[in-house]
Amino acid sequence: MSTIRPVFYVSDGTGITAETIGHSLLTQFSGFNFVTDRMSFIDDADKARDAALRVRAAGERYQVRPVVVNSCVDPQLSMILAESGALMLDVFAPFIEPLERELNAPRHSRVGRAHGMVDFETYHRRINAMNFALSHDDGIALNYDEADVILVAVSRAGKTPTCIYLALHYGIRAANYPLTEEDLESERLPPRLRNYRSKLFGLTIDPERLQQIRQERRANSRYSAAETCRREVATAERMFQMERIPTLSTTNTSIEEISSKVLSTLGLQREMF
């Protein structure tokens, strides 16, 4: 059996929902080479027919049945896509009818509700959070009064991508503080962070993994040396323990999982955008 399987994320909007769900499903299966393709804004019959032709062509090329993860809200478009002969995984279809029965109300099919700019106030909060994360990255700005969370860690432990994810998906004002050699020498919480204990969350990482990451940035330097990585991680972990800062290892943890842990630990209740 061929291990190659074409997978299409098809949507009448951005395709983010279909791709996110599809990716989560595919990670449950090993030993396959999934060839993925996102087809966004398939919002009329002509586009749906063109998409179905592309899916069918992929099946003929790889001699295997394609998979379509479909988030189109119009049932007619889904029917056209199904003519491709692909395995259809509909994101919304299994849930719409039960909800209609439970709520005793018909659905109002609206394209792009999940990731469109429907609520300007929410969108504005999201953009402001992103600007905040970028301006407070790696200790660039030290005014943390408006921060919802401050991630603390040694360099290259995953602070920046986590802050950006929190901003984009939850509208969280996330700052991050890189522990310097001076901070680590004292093994105490840096003075500029002491007034913000309730906002602090520590990230740690396996020293070997940290060395691999740092080698990509600055190979064969003191910064990326194995001993430096071991010392910095061990010292940071002692500091977190002494200062009672909640901590999570990023070594084998996805950004999504890190973000969820940060939110739950600090009691930040936000809906995902």
Swiss-Prot record:
Name the InterPro entries on file.
Kinase-pyrophosphorylase (IPR005177), PSRP (IPR026530)
Pfam families of this UniProt entry? Kinase-PPPase
Determine the domain of life of the protein's source. Bacteria
- Where does this protein hold ADP? A153, V154, S155, R156, A157, G158, K159, T160
For molecular function, the Gene Ontology terms on record are: ADP binding; ATP binding; phosphotransferase activity, phosphate group as acceptor; protein serine/threonine kinase activity
Catalysed reaction(s) here are: [pyruvate, water dikinase] + ADP = [pyruvate, water dikinase]-phosphate + AMP + H(+); [pyruvate, water dikinase]-phosphate + phosphate + H(+) = [pyruvate, water dikinase] + diphosphate
Q: What is its EC number?
A: 2.7.11.33, 2.7.4.28
Record key words, sorted: Kinase, Nucleotide-binding, Serine/threonine-protein kinase, Transferase
Q: Does the keyword Ligase apply?
A: no
Give the first-level EC class, as a single word.
transferase
Describe its function: Bifunctional serine/threonine kinase and phosphorylase involved in the regulation of the phosphoenolpyruvate synthase (PEPS) by catalyzing its phosphorylation/dephosphorylation.
Give the family from UniProt: Belongs to the pyruvate, phosphate/water dikinase regulatory protein family. PSRP subfamily.
**NCBIfam families recorded for this chain?**
PRK05339.1 (NF003742)
The protein's name: Putative phosphoenolpyruvate synthase regulatory protein
The protein's organism comes out as: Xanthomonas campestris pv. campestris (strain B100)
